[in-house]
A protein has these predicted regions:
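Domain-level recognition of nuclease-like catalytic cores that cleave nucleotide substrates
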Residues: 149-176
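Extended alpha-helical interface modules used as scaffolds for assembling large macromolecular complexes
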Residues: 1-145, 172-176
Length: 176
């Protein structure tokens, strides 16, 4: 998180979102850290259905950037509470490109590194399902070598979790 004011704003925003849904928040974070994509999908879709509007998430391919930015910001807000264990960065260069979100463990022996890539489903890119969109995100992580920063900082490749988040309106699908 860039600075204290932004961090404070995210914390306040997230606490407001989850004041009635703290179980969902904790479930999502626990699932993310444990690599449990089933629980991540269940929780994120419950949150999406109960909290988001189609005006937030967009419905058409022409709205590709807006929903990606919306989900990107939302997930960053969820991750803010992990700042004591991770260095959380967004839209930084690593390898041959710029990843969406990276969690670099402050202690690589205790915690895994995490890379998250967001994609909006789009038939024009040959995607037939949200699973295709997830595959596209995961391929991008590999082809662009986003893990380079983590490995350079001592996180072994086998301790790096790579997640693709795919979106179509309020539908969310997450894979590894």
């Amino acid at each position: 998180i860039v600075n204290y004011e932004v961090m404070h704003m995210f914390r306040k925003l997230v606490k407001g979102w989850f004041s009635k849904n703290s179980k969902h928040y904790n479930d999502f974070i626990r699932a993310l850290l444990n690599g449990n994509v089933y629980e991540m999908n269940k929780t994120m879709n419950e949150l999406s259905l109960s909290m988001f509007s189609s005006f937030d998430t967009g419905n058409r391919p022409s709205e590709r950037l807006r929903p990606e930015r919306f989900y990107h910001g939302f997930v960053l807000g969820l991750l803010v509470e992990l700042r004591d264990r991770y260095i959380i960065t967004s839209n930084r260069e690593s390898g041959y490109g710029r990843y969406d979100v990276m969690l670099e463990p402050k202690n690589a022996e205790e915690n895994d590194g995490i890379i998250i890539e967001f994609k909006v489903y789009d038939e024009e890119y040959g995607e037939k399902t949200l699973e295709d969109t997830i595959k596209s995100a995961l391929i991008q992580i590999e082809e662009k070598k986003y893990a380079q920063t983590l490995t350079e900082h001592g996180v072994p490749e086998e301790k790096i979790k790579k997640y693709g988040f795919a979106f179509e309106g309020k539908k969310v699908r997450i894979g590894m």
